[in-house]
Amino acid sequence: NLNIEMKIPEGMDKAHISDYLEKMYYGNVQLFNEHKNQIVKYDAVLIDEIQDYHRSWMEIIKNFFRDPQGDYVLFGDVKQNIYGQPTLQKDVVTNVRSVNELKYCFRSDFKVRDLAQSFQKNVFGDKYDTDDFSENGSYDFFGQQQQKEGYINYMYLQDKDHIRSLYNIIRGNILNKAGNISPNDITILGFTTGLFRTFDAYYRYACREKTNSMLETIETMYMSNLNYIGKNNDKNPNTGWFNNITEHLKKKLFIKRTTLYDTDIIKLRQHIAILFTIYDLFVSYPENFRERLIEECDKCGISIDALIAFRKHYEEILTQFKKEVYNSNYKSIRDNKKLHFWMNSGTIKISTINSFKGWESE
């Protein structure tokens, strides 16, 4: 720890803070050179996921944190270069002279491996060298080719509503126990966060089972914004409807309380977040979630007609509020979820491709 105090200029746009810190601190070679005598040096430096590193970070680590006679070893996979770092001859550009290529993959004997390899050849064939599974020992002692576990099934979703179709396929496999599939064996991958957030809510409220999602839940999104309104109630455009529903639920949920404790406020806002989440589902799928919304309204001591009337009365401002909720940045929540990922949660896993670590679907 060099005890370097980082200062961000007042009024700087949040969108520019990351670039500013990179230029002035994280990637500032001169800054580390000025403090080089204070830096502890190591006999060996091993770096994993080198494709995520800026070149300046590599230079800083190699020149200031490694003993001049020490080892410097980098591990990386150009196919995971999701931040678009520079590449040369289908590989990540680093500050080492030679590369020892690990040509073979020994991670999987499942049939999903074939899908991954086919995807590499067809989509990334001109950009990357594809993984070679030829040395994975695919033959038994009698010279017969082994059958890989699992199966690949392609389905054309005719229904434009992919969320409902996806749910019906997955629940059908679970309920019919196709291939002895349990929720814990299922991982759903895609690239659209908006679709996955809605699917996650659809799944949980339709079948009343939990999920293990690497994305923020819609309830968490609403809760984050409700807390912000609660702390910034003065001159907030959402004050009217926020105070209205807060006071109403306060009377229904905490009948004998004149003052709410912090835990009570959290519980009340959680009810609002859940109500708003199920209401969003109800608007898109009225035949599927009307009864579920009525059930949640009963928990809050209100009728579904009263909730619908409330939403209608504040329709314009609540429509704008919903846009803000769905378009806000929740990266910190996603990072925290990835950090605390647990594979054997007993539930289905939901993740975007760039947050998917390896072969957890096995």
PLM-predicted stretches and their roles:
Residues 4-43, 49, 53-60, 348-355:
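Conserved RecA-like ASCE ATPase "motif II neighborhood" in helicase/translocase motors
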Residues 3, 44, 51-320, 327, ...:
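Conserved helicase motor core of SF1/SF2 NTP-dependent helicases
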